[in-house]
């Protein structure tokens, strides 16, 4: 086997193999131990040191000197100021091996550029040398957290806590986005929903003022009074009096008299809503109270877009939540019909809850949806809690 050998490349010891020594045309100038000037040609050069043949000047291993390395490039000479220490001296050949000391990054970059270009066979140019000296050739050292080169106990706890918090926030944000996308593309939502209870309305028999005898959500038996009203006698007789009876004296007497009456309950009911405040004037026929029978069962009435008609078959499972209840409930569709008979508008859906719904929720809005994966209730609660905070 024929192996090509480059005689210009000499390797140092195994421990120093990272520094390739090359024979560059360069010289070293320094002041000797006796203050005499020494100028010698380099035998070889590496990024870690150099070697030269010493003259008759005394030199010993361990001596420390300051000098200049002189290079000739494109008929231009330039020098590098270096500090070096004598590491070995061969008495027979007077070969002196030296090691660089306290080299700055610029000097190291220049030496590496010269050696690399020489080994690659490239022409060394002044412009390339200037570019090498101007750019940043070394990475900065990493910052140490402490004097011992590592973090302490509290530093580790803080780092783990911060990492865990960032991880939890990231998982929560991902779950929130996933839940929103699922609700948007895979869940059908009603445009509106309300808790509906069979009710009866109490209207004003005469023009006048109303005074309630019961509080909100109060229960009342059939025939029991629920409110009193007072009407002006003149307003009641208006249109029934002749011109002779409408003299100023009679008008003054009638104007000062009030007729009082009582509004009674038509069933064993509960007061769902009072539509006219106490002492407020009401017209004849105006609804005063909305009553719901005690044994009535509340249901949900919702409106869906007509494009979702295929999903609104009777028996379809739905999910809903009543405002102010905070509980996710389920039910099924029992009846569907177009709103006001108009096929181009919305579809009215009546929903029967799986669990009895308190009639006190009558009139409250409800959020109704069709579809959903198992466990969405827990996910919705978690998302609601996170957004509330």
Curated annotation (Swiss-Prot):
Predominant location: periplasm
Disulfide bond residue pairs: none
Keyword Transport (UniProt): no
Reactions accelerated catalytically: [(1->4)-beta-D-mannuronosyl](n) + GDP-alpha-D-mannuronate = [(1->4)-beta-D-mannuronosyl](n+1) + GDP + H(+)
Span of domain PilZ: 16-116
Top-level division of the source organism's lineage: Bacteria
Cell compartment(s), UniProt: Periplasm
GO terms of biological process kind: alginic acid biosynthetic process; bile acid and bile salt transport; single-species biofilm formation; xenobiotic detoxification by transmembrane export across the plasma membrane
Annotated GO CC locations: Gram-negative-bacterium-type cell wall; periplasmic space; plasma membrane
UniProt KW Iron-sulfur keyword: no
Family: Belongs to the Alg44 family.
Protein name: Mannuronan synthase
Organism ancestry: Bacteria, Pseudomonadati, Pseudomonadota, Gammaproteobacteria, Pseudomonadales
């Amino acid at each position: 086997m024929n192996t090509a050998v480059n005689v210009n490349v000499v390797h140092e010891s195994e421990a120093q193999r990272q520094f390739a020594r090359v024979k560059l045309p360069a010289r070293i100038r320094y002041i000797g131990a006796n203050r005499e000037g020494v100028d010698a040609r380099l035998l070889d050069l590496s990024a870690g040191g150099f070697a030269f043949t010493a003259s008759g000047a005394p030199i010993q291993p361990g001596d420390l000197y300051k000098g200049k390395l002189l290079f000739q490039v494109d008929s231009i000479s330039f020098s590098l100021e270096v500090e070096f220490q004598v590491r070995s001296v061969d008495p027979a050949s007077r070969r002196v091996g030296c090691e660089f000391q306290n080299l700055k990054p610029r000097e190291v970059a220049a030496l590496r550029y010269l050696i690399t270009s020489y080994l690659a066979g490239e022409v060394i140019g002044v412009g390339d040398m200037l570019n090498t000296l101007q750019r940043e050739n070394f990475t900065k050292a990493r910052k140490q957290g402490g004097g011992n080169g590592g973090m302490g106990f509290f530093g580790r706890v803080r780092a783990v806590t911060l990492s865990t918090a960032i991880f939890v926030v990231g998982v929560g944000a991902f779950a929130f986005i996933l839940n929103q996308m699922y609700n948007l593309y895979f869940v059908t939502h009603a445009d509106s929903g309300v808790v509906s209870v069979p009710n009866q309305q109490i209207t004003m028999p005469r023009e006048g003022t109303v005074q309630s005898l019961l509080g909100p959500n109060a229960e009342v038996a059939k025939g029991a009074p629920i409110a009193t009203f007072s009407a002006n006698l003149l307003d009641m007789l208006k249109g029934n009096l002749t011109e002779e009876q409408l003299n100023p004296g009679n008008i003054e007497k009638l104007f000062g008299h009030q007729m009082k009456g009582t509004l009674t309950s038509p069933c064993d009911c509960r007061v769902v809503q009072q539509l006219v405040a106490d002492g407020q004037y009401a017209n004849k026929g105006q609804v005063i109270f909305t009553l719901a029978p005690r044994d009535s069962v509340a249901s949900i009435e919702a409106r869906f877009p007509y494009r979702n008609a295929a999903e609104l078959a009777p028996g379809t499972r739905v999910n809903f939540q009543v405002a102010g209840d905070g509980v996710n409930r389920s039910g099924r569709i029992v009846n569907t019909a177009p709103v006001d008979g108009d096929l181009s508008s919305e579809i009215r859906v009546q929903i029967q809850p799986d669990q009895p719904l308190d009639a006190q929720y009558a009139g409250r809005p409800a959020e109704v949806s069709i579809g959903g994966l198992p466990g969405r209730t827990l996910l919705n609660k978690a998302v609601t809690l996170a957004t509330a905070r």
